[in-house]
Amino acid sequence: MRLGKHVSIAGGLYKATDRATKIGCNALQIFVKNPRGWKIKEVSDSEIKKLKDNIKKENMYPLVVHSSYLINMATPRDELWEKSVNSLKKEYKRTELINADYFVVHPGSHTGKGLHFGINRIIEAINSVFGEVKNGPQLLLENVAGAGSSIGSNFTELRDIINKVDDYARIGVCLDTCHAFAAGYDLRYEDGLEELLNDFDKIIGLDLLKVIHLNDSKYGLASNKDEHAHIGEGEIGEKGISNIINHPLLKDKPFILETPKFSGRDKDVELVNLLRRD
């Protein structure tokens, strides 16, 4: 089982691997910059080499990069859209530089301008990134909880973006379990999970599902609220999480936890390993 967690890069990118292995992970997710700002600091060749060496030494896979928080590919505000695209390009270049496997991005919000407008704006943004960075890793669109005018809470919206991206080989999906539950898929039960997988396969295709963000949900079914809970302590619960990680179509996918931090041992990592049936 490939199980990782989103970990801090404080003190250097390469220190993320130490944090991941310390809590029992063999995969990881990071930001490549401060996620709450536009600036991106330079990183030295030695820092990048240390990260690559650590990844190889610990046999960690995949290395997933998550885009920063301020990016909105769907915004009608030209200045924000330009900033978003420029930041995406810089982060995507760094993702390529460190040999990361995937780059996860939230589609964004059209803020009232309309779904059609927002989707076209997202397509334009991704094509601009791919046009400048020719050999980067797969960019994964993440499903969202469905609050407000956000795009990507249903698979049809994600498909409409994917089908019009110029470089189809470089696009995929990251499925967030908390977001799917918040958007209406009842992952507490096997029937709800089967419904999700059937819809995903019919609309997008399971071959494009590359990474799963394994998160419990603080809020109830179809709440459209995005707040992650510790595994087994949220509304999806242990049984629901167990169904997900042991499903024949999902068990070989990489799982990344984005649950709240623990001060010591990571009980989420431990519980997921206990729930896994080999």
Swiss-Prot record:
Binds 3 Zn(2+) ions. This is Probable endonuclease 4. Zn(2+) 2 binds at E142, D176, H213, E258. Zn(2+) 1 binds at H66, H106, E142. It catalyses: Endonucleolytic cleavage to 5'-phosphooligonucleotide end-products. HAMAP family: Nfo. One of its GO terms (molecular function) is DNA binding. CDD domains: AP2Ec (cd00019).
